[in-house]
Amino acid sequence: MNRLSKELGVTCTVDVGLMSIVFNCFDGNDCVSQSLSIANTGVNTSKLYRMEQFVDHFPEEEAHMTGEDIHKRLDEIEEIHALYSPAKLGLAAALACCGFTFLLGGGPVEMVLAFIAAGIGNLIRTKLIKHHYTLFLNIAVSVSAACFTYAVFLKLAELVFHIPELHEAGYICSMLFIIPGFPFITSGIDLAKLDLRSGLERLTYAIIIVMVATLFAWIMALLLHLEPADFTALHLSAAARLIFRVIASFCGVFGFSIMFNSSHSMAATAAFIGAIANTLRLELVDFTHMPPAAAAFIGALTAGLLASFIKKSNGYPRISLTVPSIVIMVPGLYLYRAIYNFGIMSLTDAVSWFTSAIMIIVMLPLGLIFARILTDRTFRYCT
């Protein structure tokens, strides 16, 4: 808006929230005000990319068009809806959670079961969103479905393949598709620019999703007799673990990026960034014994710097690359274990998990913010 108002020779003020926006425009003589509110919110990186292209090309193209032609161009962008069917989005969530499972310490059994359960859970969630069901309902139903599916397929695997019950911990990973990474991280970026209304509303939205999801997952765990135990140790060499982490990080970020409605090329670019940044984070924790929160800051900073460098060549919006690439670093496992332990009144463990989660969650947007400060002059100063 700053760039377009400068091109048009007008002054603009805007009040942005999660569900509404109020816009005022002055040209020295007249004032025009517009307001808009929506019933639901979501992420559409493809539309964001087209909007950024519109702004970038405005001085050469749109500035010479009539008002009617500009409205037609904006209408074309507005018509960009979901690029993928619910089945494909379910598959994307399955891939993301499968990669997430390995990165959290799970083995092949947990990965396969999480793949199936997360795919079904997100398929149901996508169907509910498509039919405009309320946020609480789609979170509760999709998380419950994922946990139930994991438990059913684990029991079938025990009966058919004689797999031991040691693999039940993976049920946590099957619901990680619900993690509100985009609002969590963008709320921090908004707060860094003192956009308090937008930042606090996004943060509140993210907290609501986490609370509802973890509470229903806890209830399902009690009903299905599941416990968030530690994963069985994987006996891998350092080199093999490094290679698998790169692959799992790439797959996880690619899946999350597809869920954000990115094109295949945009998702692959974000996955490339995430594979480097997340593997670096995990290796720092393992080999330098760096605290996870500090490693998360370095990982997010790396992702932000890489995205800024790549943006110069392909023009993808920075936020469409950075957020998917670090969503996989959001400690959903820690948050769930915190709520689970609160539920069974194991308060010492709950506070420990919750504190660790908060430290990492704060560090992730902080890393992106400082990467943006280093590489974006307009972000470096108050505007």
PLM features: what roles do these ranges have?
Residues F58-K72, A87-C97, F115-R125, A221-P228, ...:
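Hydrophobic, membrane-facing alpha-helical anchors
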Residues L83-T186, I258-F260, H264, T269:
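Core alpha-helical transmembrane segments of integral membrane proteins
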Residues L103-A117, L166-P180, T232-A248, T288-L301, ...:
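Structural signature of hydrophobic alpha-helical transmembrane segments
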Residues A157-L166, L224-A238, N341-W353:
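Membrane-interface helix termini and inter-helical loops of multi-pass transporters
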Residues G170-M175, G188, L194-I209, F272, ...:
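C-terminal transmembrane helix-loop-helix hairpin of multi-pass membrane proteins
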Residues T186-L236, A240-F256:
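Membrane-embedded hairpin module used as a gating/binding unit in multi-pass transport
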